[in-house]
Amino acid sequence: MPIVTAYDTLGEEGLMHSLKQTHAKLIFLDPHLLTKLINPLKETKDIQYVVYNSQMEVNKDDIEKLKEAHPHLTILSFDELTKKGEENMVEPVPPQPEDLCCIMYTSGSTGTPKGVLLKHKNVIAASP
């Protein structure tokens, strides 16, 4: 399962671009960004799950606003997601070197952000 990075500094347009291009199903973010998803998710219908960082304080009103705007979403803390994984164990599927690991979006300084495809072998080769 590849991960996709997106800079929150790119604003709604940059986020919509990366979500549309990758058809992401899940997004991880810090809780202060929850309401920043409301408008982009009107245009990008693939997101089904929102997981927020458990180590930061969350405003429950922000969760409610997002849920009200997009009732189809499952919104969880990272701790809740971890617990669900512990309760529903599956056999690991190790990636192959040629499998896509990450789509890393550029900052978009010269226009629309571009997604750089990194395979698992690229990430391993870059490790110290």
Give residue ranges: language-model regions.
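Conserved pre-ATP/AMP-binding loop-to-beta segment of ANL
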Residues: 73-76, 83-105, 112
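Structural core segment of the AMP-binding/adenylate-forming
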Residues: 2-80
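Residue-identity detector for glycine
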Residues: 11-14, 85, 108-111, 115
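Conserved AMP-binding A3 loop
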Residues: 101-125
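Active-site micro-motifs of SAM-dependent methyltransferase domains
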Residues: 35, 83, 124-125
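Alpha-helix capping and helix-loop boundary segments enriched in small/acidic/polar residues
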Residues: 6, 10, 94, 114-121
